[in-house]
Amino acid sequence: MAHLTQFEKRRQRVRTALRQRAAGRPRLSVHRSGRHIYAQLIDDAAGTTLAAASTLDKDVRGKTGATTAAAADVGKRLAAAAKKAGVTQVVFDRGGFLFHGRIKALADAAREGGLEF
């Protein structure tokens, strides 16, 4: 068996817990890199993306995506797109990332925008 990094172990642990709690709700999946942050709502049953937002979107592209303010903006835009798609309840998938900094800012902004998790 291949040796898993701490990040990969954490990701597996989070995904396993999500499967138990999902109950048919879409998954709000978050990924961050050194420069950008990405978020999408995924319907795992159908295998489709319902809504997505990132710091690479055209209206935000000129700004840096490596700040908590940018992450909060992505969270607000994702919540608006989710409302437009008719989604209010989701399961938050932080992947292997700690719930801190940009991930927390995105989650808080999505909650303020009307998503429940």
From Swiss-Prot:
Keywords: Ribonucleoprotein, Ribosomal protein, RNA-binding, rRNA-binding. The keyword Ligase does not apply. Part of the 50S ribosomal subunit; part of the 5S rRNA/L5/L18/L25 subcomplex. Contacts the 5S and 23S rRNAs. One of its GO terms (biological process) is translation. Disulfide bonds: none annotated. This is Large ribosomal subunit protein uL18. Belongs to the universal ribosomal protein uL18 family. It comes from Sphingopyxis alaskensis (strain DSM 13593 / LMG 18877 / RB2256) (Sphingomonas alaskensis). NCBIfam families: L18_bact. GO terms for cellular component: cytosolic large ribosomal subunit. One of its GO terms (molecular function) is 5S rRNA binding. It comes from the Bacteria. This is one of the proteins that bind and probably mediate the attachment of the 5S RNA into the large ribosomal subunit, where it forms part of the central protuberance. It holds the Pfam family Ribosomal_L18p. Coiled coil: none annotated. CDD domains: Ribosomal_L18_L5e.
